[in-house]
A protein has these predicted regions:
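Class I SAM-dependent methyltransferase SAM/SAH-binding core
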Residues: 45-87
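A short acidic, Gly/Pro-enriched loop at the edge of an enzyme's catalytic core
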Residues: 90-99
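A short, conserved alpha-helix within the catalytic core of class I
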Residues: 106-118
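Conserved beta-strand signature within the Rossmann-like core of class I S-adenosyl-L-methionine
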Residues: 122-133
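Core SAM-dependent methyltransferase catalytic element
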Residues: 169-194
């Protein structure tokens, strides 16, 4: 186990969410080498830890950063405690990122700011729950569930979409998800391995 691999924690908010999402792992290589990655609403930091292991600097941002406190001594990890839902937008000024990762989180007013915070050739990797998920598990509140095609519509005009999916997944349990990988580039993006 490397120093940046997450360790199981029985008090985790997202039980069983120790390993990075396969969607994030698949598209992580699209983040330009040496650039800083933003793990937004990072929770345990499982995705940011993956990018640390890939050699990136990472900004871990969440309202409660206690689950990434073990990274406080790492010079490549910046920990930012902020409530993203106060209406102030991203608390990161004009910074641009080589990658932005968001999973299992939706605050619609932030979507335009995410595209604006992505640096040239940077990659946005976003995966969260969609409408219909309420039939299987939480979240059930429509405010926390993407409408069909919403993620594509939010980023398809500003970024080059490399991959998009919306539908029912059965692993590890049934859920409706939407996910997108998109780059801030006019040039054709290399396709990630399947």
């Amino acid at each position: 186990m490397t120093p940046h691999e997450p360790t199981p924690d029985p008090d985790m908010r997202h039980a069983g969410a120790v390993e990075p999402s396969p969607w994030v792992v698949r598209f992580a290589p699209l983040a330009p080498s040496g650039g800083t990655v933003l793990d937004l609403a990072c929770g345990t930091g499982r995705h940011g830890r993956h990018f640390l292991a890939r050699g990136h600097n990472v900004v871990f941002l969440d309202r409660d950063v206690s689950l990434v406190a073990d990274l406080a001594g790492d010079a490549r990890a910046e920990i930012v405690a902020a409530d993203l839902e106060t209406g102030e937008g991203l608390p990161l000024g004009t910074r641009r990122f080589a990658g932005i990762v968001v999973t299992n989180y939706l605050w619609r007013p932030l979507l335009p700011a995410l595209a604006a915070a992505l640096g040239r050739d940077g990659v946005l990797i976003y995966e969260t729950f969609g409408r219909g998920n309420e039939a299987y598990s939480r979240p059930r509140n429509p405010d926390h569930l993407l409408r069909p095609g919403e993620l594509f519509a939010a980023f398809g005009g500003a970024l080059q979409v490399v991959a998009y999916e919306c539908g029912l997944r059965h692993d590890p349990k049934p859920r409706i998800i939407q996910r997108i990988a998109a780059v801030n580039s006019d040039a054709p993006a290399p396709l990630a391995p399947e």
